[in-house]
Amino acid sequence: LGLYCGLRREEILGLKWDCVFLDAQAPYLSVRRAWHTEHNRPVVLDELKTKASRRDIPIPCPLADCLRATKEKSSSEFVIANSDGEPLSYTQFQRLWKYITTRSTKERTYVRYINGQKIRHTITPVLGEKAAHNSTVIYSLDFQVTPHQLRHTYITNLIYAGVDPKTVQYLAGHENSKVTMDIYAKVKYNNPDVLSAVVNNALSSVYGNSVNS
């Protein structure tokens, strides 16, 4: 939901099935609720971060298929729920997210106590290998991932695909267009070759071919 729809963490954890329209000709979801916690207890409100947060987002086919399979097995009104069908507490979310981060190849340090002495043990996981302490864990991520990174990747992919800034702003739920444009400029023109072509084309239209001489 972060990678394919650009939802914020609070929007993902507050999403209910009544806002997921998988049977529509073009499946989409509506962002209408937000999750937060108070003393580790989940609270889901109809009040969103900003007016721009209220939006309808197309659901790409791979995610739509995944959501259909999930919905068939779900007895909760929430898309992401705990074993009781309730929204996740902060601790439950952290535990769930750790399932993903343990698959990262990021170097990590463990502390052991041997004969009362603290010993630091550092490991550097190798992509594709199984974890020594748990053979069910395969290191499949060569980067450290956060919910915000998934959302940022969604926005970046839209920009790379040529989606116009105003549409990106709407889909991302940005209240301020400056936020969108800052990302747009950083992504779109971070490549010197692309930037050179843009500048040359712009100046050629004004000064003619003399700009290339």
Pin down the residues of each PLM region.
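Short, charged phosphate-coordinating catalytic segments
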Residues: 2-35
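Short, basic (Lys/Arg/His-rich) helix/loop patches that form interaction surfaces
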Residues: 5, 57, 72-79, 83-87, ...
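Gram-positive cell-envelope targeting signals
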Residues: 11-14, 87-93, 149, 154, ...
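Key DNA-contacting residues within the recognition helix of helix-turn-helix
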Residues: 13, 156, 169, 180-181
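C-terminal secondary-structure termini that scaffold catalytic or DNA-interacting sites
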Residues: 24, 39-54, 61-63, 83-84, ...
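Generic structural detector for well-ordered beta-strands
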Residues: 30, 56-58
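Active-site/binding-pocket entry motifs
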Residues: 35-37, 63-65, 73
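Catalytic-site neighborhood detector that most strongly recognizes the C-terminal catalytic loop/helix
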Residues: 64, 172-198
